[in-house]
Amino acid sequence: MQHFSRTFLAASIATALFAPYAQAEAILNNSVQEMPTTDQCLVDAEKNDANAEIVIQADNLQAINGDKAIYSGDVEVTQGNKKITAESVTLHQQENIVVAEGNVTFNDGEVKASSSKVTNNMTSETFSLENTEYQFLCQQGRGQAAYIAKTGQAVYELEDGSITSCPADDNAWRLVASSIEVDQDEETATFYHPRFEVLDVPVFYAPYLTLPIGNTRKTGFLFPSVNYGSSDGLEIEVPFYWNIAPNYDLTLTTLYMQQRGVKQDADFRYLSDGWGSGELKGEYLPGDEKYNDEDRWGYQYKHDGIINKQWLVSLDYSQVSDIDYFRDLSSDLGNREDGQLMQQGKVAYRSDFWDMSLQVRDFQILLQDNNQPYRLLPQVKFNFYTPLLGNYLNFDVKSELTQFDIQDASKPNALRAHVEPGLTIPLSTSWATWTTEARLLATYYQQDLDRLTDPTLKSQLDETVARVIPEYRSHARIYLEREAKLFEGYTQSLEPQIQYLYVPEEEQGNIYNYDTTLLQTDYYGLFRSRKYSSIDKIAAANQLSYGASTRFFDDEYKERLNISFGQIYYIDKKTKLTGNQEETSNYSSWAVETDFNYEDFLFYHGGIQYDIDLNAMQLANSTLEYQFTDGFIQGNYRYVTKDYIEDTISFDELDKITRKGISQAGIVGAYNINRHWSASGQYYYDLTEEIDLEWMASLRYQSDCWYIGFTYTNQLVKWRNDVVGGDSNNPVYDTNISVNFGIQGFATKNKAETAAKELDSTDNAITYGRPFYLNN
């Protein structure tokens, strides 16, 4: 039998009987050249037009009564972005329906599939697929189904189907259900009687489940994560996300802990129109089995907003059930500082020449000691500033009114009022600045001594104190620049500076210390006007600070090296705060800071304070980090003498912290072994006590759709008898081995990170940091 060519069938027979539906092969070939890649998402492309021409080519064609045509042999049907291939295709002219059978492939730019049968209404663009393997092209998701129907513009119904975010030939996990509804516009999938399978083994069942399948915020369950640790045993976390409105959402998380019970977490977020944004978090663990069956809870409310560009509102209030809450349970509640949970609110107003604020601050103590901080109930600040003679003279006033309150009866409550007017003469050129200022610090205290239980302290303090102290400061700085002679191609700057500071000595022993601490005197601290963080103690000064910085910049003006050094000369040695003034010189310790960046892969930072009277270091820190394509390694060291600690902070029980000062060395590293495997670790050692401080090692495997991590931690948590060192005071460690497992893809709460990035979020006491301060 003679075989007719495909061109003859398409152009002669089909055109005569079904002119609107069949075109010559030449037209088809031109169309094929313009079609995009078949596996490409075309959801943003021009939508298929139901009136677009239908192009069919096949080896054979049979026409029946002008009503339908049967195509067979390598049949290919195209309409706009849609393409169907099959062994046989029947075209029903009246209904404009195509029925394809036998090794059918289907692709409409949103889903591609391989099926035994496809029925497609070419007018309404609805279709059904039988015995199908499918893959969504515009969202994650692939799987199998006995029957798939597209009932809307982007709505799919699957019967006896499955879905996974894993790539082809990877069935690490999948969701199997009797019925699945997928809405690609809403990016949600609804499952009826789903079961979750890992390596084809069912591990979870629910009668009903809704999951997001895209990156936009959609209501539904997020995939669970599994963790096993030697401290709390098996942990299973199941989050549910509720997209209440475009500016409101709520995440509810159920956390099962084998050795503690079931913990419920809630996180509500909002974004208001003109009032800012906020967040309300709550956590509740009834009957903690490892904490005497006590209920444990915590909450935080946080709001930040700018109103009418001038009003600022900030609120951060947190509270937990007990002081061991954060030690026992993993939680990101609150703002914690120095063993205290902050509870504070602030309202501020700013204009062109003045600003004011009202602040209230309280704490929840998380340590078992008597070192309670003061509450601010409240603190009001007012500042005014204006130029008087153009840019040659500025006038400003700083003021505050603070009520200090504390529950500890061994410390006084107080009202503090402070007014600080100042005149500033700022002079500047392109290569130098010179700022001279004079200020008057006037402070009034009303101290409540009746409640004091300490008679010695009561005799030292006065109920009312009025203190007025003048301050004079003159600070000059020069910027010089040249082509570097030592390093060709680099620009070197030299920035010497000098400052004179005078503050007369004033007896202040009758004033209690409410919120003031001694500031660290590093290189940049040499040129401050104050030695303390607040105004309860105004240190006398008659001193000359001097120092210089030199910087090296490459041809792109990227800073590569910075060396700074300086010192204070005390004209009046009595104003020197540290050491015995009779036995020491008029000079402070040398302060040196160094930063180095070599070709963006080798970084160094170091700081030293060298005491010239003792010919010894007081304080030092050093960090060296080498970065390479797939990871980094960092070594660091910190050193502080006990004398420096005693001079800097006021702590009655220093032996609970250190016997000989601080001398600690550490090494931190991370490496992405390949596309899937990564490892990280850190180790810190105390050279004074010759003991381990902290161990952490992590190994993680991460595929395209799941991850598993193994972590070992060993941390020094305290000393026996609460005293550092000694034969009977052994260190106490907390050791934990954990395994965590999670799903990647759609509906995951947090995408799994590599082990290197995990260093930023570990629960270890000493976390990974990059203390490099070059201007890059």
UniProtKB/Swiss-Prot annotation:
Any Pfam family hit: LptD_N
Keyword ATP-binding tagged: no
Locations listed in the record: Cell outer membrane
InterPro entries per record: LipoPS_assembly_LptD (IPR020889), LptD (IPR050218), LptD_C (IPR007543), OstA-like_N (IPR005653)
GO cellular component, one term: transporter complex
Signal peptide: 1-24
Main location class: membrane
Superkingdom classification of source: Bacteria
Keywords of this entry: Cell outer membrane, Membrane, Signal
Gene Ontology BP terms: Gram-negative-bacterium-type cell outer membrane assembly; lipopolysaccharide transport
Complex formation: Component of the lipopolysaccharide transport and assembly complex. Interacts with LptE and LptA.
Family to which this protein belongs: Belongs to the LptD family.
Protein task: Together with LptE, is involved in the assembly of lipopolysaccharide (LPS) at the surface of the outer membrane.
HAMAP family to which the protein is assigned, alphabetical: LPS_assembly_LptD (MF_01411)
Protein name: LPS-assembly protein LptD
